Every structure is written in structure tokens, then in C-alpha cells.
Amino acid sequence: MQREYDYIIIGAGSAGNVLAARLTEDPGVTVLLLEAGGPDYRVDFRTQMPAALAFPLQGRRYNWAYETEPEPYMDNRRMECGRGKGLGGSSLINGMCYIRGNALDFDHWAKRPGLEDWSYRDVLPYFRKAETRDIGANDYHGGDGPVSVATPKNDNNVLFHAMVEAGVQAGYPRTGDLNGYQQEGFGPMDRTVTPRGRRASTARGYLDMAKPRDGLHIVTHATTDRILFAGKRAIGVHYLVGNSSEGIDAHARREVLVCAGAIASPQLLQRSGVGAPDLLRALDVQLVHDLPGVGQNLQDHLEVYIQYACTKPVSLYPALQWWNQPAIGAQWLFAGTGTGASNQFEAGGFIRTREEFDWPNIQYHFLPVAINYNGSNAVKEHGFQAHVGSMRTPSRGRVHAKSRDPRQHPSILFNYQSTDQDWQEFRDAIRITREIIAQPALDAYRGREISPSADCKTDAELDAFVRSRAETAYHPSCSCAMGTDAMAVVDGQGRVHGMEGLRVIDASIMPRIITGNLNATTIMIAEKIADRVRGRTPLPRSTADYYIAGDAPVRG
């Protein structure tokens, strides 16, 4: 087998597959793509049917199933930290919500030294490059990219429309496109689903395009043990295949690109000798480069479910009954339509809870059934719910490798809810959600409040609910942050500070978490840096306008 390549990419996920596809567009370029998981089996409904999104989180075939250390502000719970395993990475198991973040997230990044070319108008062309939206291209959306994006249709569940209307009746804006001119407000939510109703992972969109090329070599079930260095230059990787303890060395003529995600990328750097000296010493790892920010600055989104009974039989509750599922599956399999062809997150929104926030600090996902994200604790009656959570928590966590063993999970601590702002935002969010659900648009459907229940009212009671019931939104990020400060890990092109031939390109390099789901932005990051790796001129900046709230009230 060939053992030398131009580039070695570690992780065939949301970013790694983008890079594999783009780098091999250049004639003669060779790429080794290593993935610790297996293939994205197209016959497996668990990963291919949008409505089955909870199934991959319930096992370990497609999910690393990490757990945090006891979270000190969350009743010392060990909390889920699911990450994708297999071709497609987390795009193979995520909720398929196509949300890019707010324009001001990127303008905020661009205010940091060294990140001036990460403003919204700089990154928008790369969002467009990646996307094919089913209703066509415009100034904000692409029409010929590898990622299929589906828009909600008017004949979808009536509860989606009622919940959006309720948000507007409560005084918040209406927006027709959460990824367009104005994110703030309530409206339809796009999703990464193909026209045939299949999950649009990066394995389907990017790898299918790249697999026929002679320059791309993909190895699945390949766990990267460590990066190999000659001095400060990355020259290759040492990896294990399957359960074997016999390692294989592969060498990179140009660069090693780490795309293992916000948990595994810092863990791999630490095991390879790049990180904080005290940690590496404790692991008995030889120091290659002192970089204290590796694994620090870890951020995530936390959310709660506000659940209600539905007084009319219009929810998706019947779809949870086993006797209805064969027909749903058949319609999806043969026609690519019906309940199975949607992730059922087709409406949502973003609001500011207080005037002090310049752009939205709270996100909503509306769901026409009452159930946990991972498929557990389904309410045994017709119901609906709002997922609500804060977007830019001041809390910061960390990822630490526990040993040199590449198969041992790292120590993860998010420090969820460690600041007063965190608690205030969740109290506000729950109370505002109740106001929204109380609007006339939902009078025909609103039953009793199931969770947390109407008698949960005081600050102390709401805080107790959040401590015991809040869950991750599965958005870990920022643990190898871009920047030039002492705790930055990479520069604005993903190059690891103080090293040569080594980049990190995935959600870990976000300097600050964005306002929304992470998959679309992770793909954009990879598209943008791919041009840098290839030595190409960046795409021209967009001239599209975007909404800035300014002095506008949070409610009209």
C-alpha cells in the first residue's frame, strides 16, 4: 500500500470530507483520508432517514458516545457528548438543521487580530459555494454546491405554522429565511436533506464527488495514534486499523490536516506532544511544542425542552407507534417523501431576551411531538415542544487526553452554567417561551404544560429544572481556537502556531461559538481554508446586506 501522500487528513467528517474533495480537484494531488469509524452505509435507515435522527445517538456504531466529567453546576451530572463516527462524522448523526449563525458572529471574529478576513461578507461566498438550495440561488444561498438544502413547504405540519405565528403575536419579528438578510425572529428552518429525502451528509455530498479520483485514498476503521514530527514539522501520522495494535506509518509531503472535531482534535494534538507542558508531562508524552491553549476554551450550547400536550390529534405522536412505522418507512424508501423524509425541525427562531444583546442570544427549535432529542422519554400522548437554549455562554471548559492510548476517551468538562449570565438567560428563555405558547395562534392546540409544569415558576424552581434536565445541543467547539493571543492554537488559516506542515480545520478552531447549529459553519470553514491550502485566491467578498438590530427593541 502507498505510504506517502501530499496531504493526510485525519477525520472524514464535516470538515475533512470537504478538504478531501477540494484538494483532489487539483490534478496529481494525493490525499490519505483516515476515519476511525466505518462507511456511511446507504442501506441503513438509521443514518439515511431524516426522521430517524435519534437512532444513531443510541448506540456506538456511529457515535463516540463521550461523557463529560461530573458537571459541577449541573447537579454533578455526567452529561452526553455525542460525536459522529464514520464517513460523514457528525454530519452523519446530527439533527440536519441548516443554520449558519448570525452575521455578527463572524464580524465579531473579524475584530480579533489576525482574523480580519473572517467577517460575514468574507465567509458568505463560502457558505454559498457549499450549498444547493432546493428553491434556487440568491445573494445568500448557493445553487450548485455539494450540500443539498431543503426548505420547508407550506403543507407541512400545522403546528410549525402555529408556533411561528405565536412568536410573532408575542411581539418578535417574522423572518422568511434564518440564513438570509435577517436571522432575528421566527420562521421556517432549512435542513440538510436531499431532494430524495435522504440525509445530506458530507460523505454523500463531497466524498461521492471525490471517490472516483485516483488521488484519494480512504481508510476506514483507522484510529490515528499520533502525528509524526521532524523537529517542528509534521511529516506524517501513525495509525491503527481495526482492533490491531500494529501501527502503520504514513508520510505527508506537504501537510497534515487535523479534522477530528472539537473533542478529538485537541486530544490528538496532546497525545502527539503539542499542548500544555504540565499535561503532557503527566501523560508521559514528549513535548514537541508548548501550546497551552490546546483543549482550552471549550464551548457548547445547552438547551431545555418546554413541552405541552396537544388538544388536537395533529402532532407526530402516531409516528412513534410501531404499527405505523412500516408504512412511513416504505413511503420514505420508495418515494423519498412523507414523515420519514423530514427531520421534523422545520420551524424555529432567534431572539434577544434583553436590550443589552446586540444580536440574538436565544435559539428555538419547534418540534410537533414531545420527546427527547435522543429518542428517549417520549410523552405517550399528542404533544409539541420548544427546544430553547442560550447561544453565547460565557462559560468555558476544556478537553484533556487521559493517556497515550488513542482508544481511551478524553476528560471533558464544559463547566455548563458557571456564570450568573447563564442562569439569567435560561430563566428569561423559559418565561418568554411560556408567553409565546400562550398566544392565540396556539389556542386550538395548547393543552397543559408537561415539562417543566406550570407550577415551576420561581427563579429557584427554574434553576433546579435547568440543573436537572438541561441537555447538550451537541455543539462542542472552540477548543483549538483561531487567533494570535497567548491561548490561540491556530492562525486564521488553521496553521498551528509554532509548527510547520500542520493545520487544524474543524469546529474546534472557532474562536467563539456561533449563534446557531454548527454543521454549516464547519463546512464553510473547511471550504474557506481549502482555498488557502491550495494557494488559491479567496473568493470575492459578498456585497449582500444584513440586519443589525441597533436600537430596535427586542419586541415590536
From Swiss-Prot:
GO CC annotation terms, alphabetical: membrane
Binding-site residues, FAD: 6-35
Cofactor requirement: FAD
Keywords: FAD, Flavoprotein, NAD, Oxidoreductase
Example GO BP: glycine betaine biosynthetic process from choline
SUPFAM superfamilies in the cross-refs: FAD-linked reductases, C-terminal domain, FAD/NAD(P)-binding domain
PROSITE patterns, alphabetized: GMC_OXRED_1, GMC_OXRED_2
Annotated catalytic residues: 475
Reactions catalysed: choline + A = betaine aldehyde + AH2; betaine aldehyde + NAD(+) + H2O = glycine betaine + NADH + 2 H(+)
Pfam assignment, any one: GMC_oxred_N
EC number assigned by the record: 1.1.99.1, 1.2.1.8
Entry annotated with the keyword Oxidoreductase: yes
Biological pathway: Amine and polyamine biosynthesis; betaine biosynthesis via choline pathway; betaine aldehyde from choline (cytochrome c reductase route): step 1/1
Keyword flag Amino-acid biosynthesis: no
First-tier enzyme category under EC: oxidoreductase
Top-level division of the source organism's lineage: Bacteria
A Gene Ontology molecular function term of the record: betaine-aldehyde dehydrogenase (NAD+) activity
Family listed: Belongs to the GMC oxidoreductase family.
Function: Involved in the biosynthesis of the osmoprotectant glycine betaine. Catalyzes the oxidation of choline to betaine aldehyde and betaine aldehyde to glycine betaine at the same rate.
Protein name: Oxygen-dependent choline dehydrogenase
Organism: Xanthomonas axonopodis pv. citri (strain 306)
Organism ancestry: Bacteria, Pseudomonadati, Pseudomonadota, Gammaproteobacteria, Lysobacterales
